[in-house]
Amino acid sequence: MEMVEPDAHLVALKVMRLMRPTLVGLGPVVTCEPTDLVQRFSSSQESDGMSGACAETLAAGQVLLLPQSFGSIYLGETFASYICVHNTTPNPVECVTVKADLQSNTSRINLSMHENAKSPVVLPPGGTIDDVIRYEVKEIGTHILVCEVNYSTPAGYAQSLRKFFKFQVLKPLDVKTKFYNAEIDEIYLEAQIQNVTTSPFCLEKVELDGSEDYSVTPLNTLPNGESVFTVKHMLQPNNSCQFLYCIKPKGDIAKNVDTLRQFNNVGKLDIVWRSNLGEKGRLQTSQLQRLPFECKTLRLEVLDAKNTIKIGTIFTFNCRVTNTSEHPMKLNVRLAAKFSPDSQYTGCADFMLNLLQSGESAEFPLSVCPSKLGLVKITPLVLTNTLQNEQFTIENVVDVFVVNSDYDNDTTTHQNKLIRYESAASCLTQKQVQLQVV
């Protein structure tokens, strides 16, 4: 048996991070061997009187570079490492166990190895045990991979070998959201995603997973199904792109104002991307919350209003008004057109509705005759509560596009339920959201 130094170990521990190579530029080639192609090219250029100065340098493109260290990784990507334990002695080593832990600023996670193997094991001379560990990093900051090997010497003494490998987990994306509360039940979400890495990547999927209380309609494709983006979501470093979604409350929630006030969580953004060499990453935002719903006194819904109508045709649309206050209302409805050459339509209305208790609704039709081509805005509609002497003015009731009588178009398209609120405020906010791993 050979003598082993006291500080030496009977086994060698090797750890290598598994990752795709990177593209690096080598810059111009200024020296080369005489037999190299570059040297021959340089000689021919020097003998050519028409060649310019510095033609002896040949710029090299990017080449693949294997990882030289643990480096860094981006949040949402999968950390993979190859761990190998080798018996460097001519004698067997008994009771060999290998353990790997990943330590962050807030947690310490055990990464299982050799799940189907018996532990501990006996390493014969020159023998090796190895395994690949994988973990999807879920926290930004400094991480330390702790690898520990325990074994017994031929004399029966327990020995331990431990190594530490430090790497950084960086933020790959910056996500900002803007909510637009329209004067209807619809909410529009604009999500801006910025690439904060040092290399380009491709956004493979950006979806808004709606909550159980809201339905989501993406607005990022053209009517023919093509994406609005000319390049398939390719983002260069520090560049950003925007995605738009329409969010609507479901079923009974949209009908009940009090219920609508309670449900503000609309869903989460699910983002999947790939690096320039195909490395996959996935992140999900925290729960996105819409702006607080405000409806002070009443709301008006426009039902079954056509988008397009021919000039000279009566434009009729139905309305529903709901008393959202805590006291009863006796409403007078008045729609008046200005009698002037510049008036866009003719027609008026002035009538009373039945008494509306709190939460009750009433429907009524309104009719006008457009007198101008183009987009005609029906406004204003004045609702007066005669019991409290309150007056509510709806500035923009509905829009209709008026065309010539020979215009050939399908006029069966109707606007879906448009819900307008009294005293609708500015409904825009911008918010930076928190990313998390799913």
Swiss-Prot record:
Superkingdom in the source lineage: Eukaryota
Record InterPro entries: TRAPPC13, TRAPPC13_C, TRAPPC13_M, TRAPPC13_N
One Gene Ontology biological process: Golgi vesicle transport
One Pfam family this sequence matches: TRAPPC13_N
GO cellular component, one term: Golgi apparatus
PANTHER family reported for this sequence: TRAFFICKING PROTEIN PARTICLE COMPLEX SUBUNIT 13
Similarity comment text for this entry: Belongs to the TRAPPC13 family.
Name of the molecule in the record: Probable trafficking protein particle complex subunit 13 homolog
Taxon lineage: Eukaryota, Metazoa, Ecdysozoa, Arthropoda, Hexapoda
